[in-house]
Amino acid sequence: MTVEKKVLYLGDDDATRAAAYLCGILARYEIDFDRVDGGTSPRDDFQSKDYALYILSDYAVSNFRPGDMEHIVEAVEKRGSGLLMLGGWESYFGRLGEYNDSPIADILPVVLQNKDDRRNDSSPVLLRPTTLDHPIVANLPWETAPGVGGYNQFEPKEGAEVLLEGYRTRISWRNVLAATQSSVQQSDVQIELLEKLPFLVVSTALRGRVAAFASDVAPHWIGGMVDWGTPRIFQELPERLGKDLFVEIGCDYAKFFAQLVRWTGAF
């Protein structure tokens, strides 16, 4: 079976809503892709061909028909396709135990929790690369990366590589009454680091590459990261997804996810 040099992006509602963000990035970087909207099943011919990369983002297990997940696993293990999972209510364990005990869980580079793994933080979760040499995180200004607000919690499997760590923070006034508008100083603000989390985990143990990113690509979980980088990008979506659809996003946000897609799909 031939691997088609193309992405299959499954999940995130449709291109008029959350899916618009990743669709816009793929269009911007001229990465060819097909779509399966959240709440719908793959096409009838799904198991007759392979894609270079399968992206699962907030895509419920119940959408798959018998044999669909096994087809993805076989494509990754034996034929070199890539697999990328992004965070969401219906990713990883999610709200109701989506991918636990599934064939997909066996090849992910992370260990899923056995309970609701969704986390929402009112203070930003700051992302820190463990290396600047990997193609996914290279050539990006991580010192200015905004924090994210939501994510799925998981642990890396043995032998997998953690490329991004997330640091939960608490930001507060030391004395809100003393810090009046006319006398606010940087010393009046307190930032605490609460917890370190694996946030982007990858593996090359199989014939194809696999990656797990804890947060979503779309608001609200991705937080201010959607606006990371100037100049801002205005990107129209392909007309096949709908009429007059577009996104406005930060250039570094777009570059990061494009690099993640290209590495995982070996483009």
Regions flagged by a language model, labelled:
Residues 1-7, 76, 182-267:
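Extracellular ligand-binding/catalytic regions of CAZymes and related secreted enzymes
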Residues 6-30:
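Short, charged N-terminal beta->alpha structural module
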Residues 13-17, 62-66, 70, 247-255:
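Soluble non-cytosolic domains of exported or imported proteins
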Residues 27-47:
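A short, well-structured beta->alpha microelement
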Residues 38-43, 70, 195-199:
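Alpha-helical scaffolding within the catalytic cores
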Residues 85-182, 192:
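An acidic, glycine-rich "communication" segment
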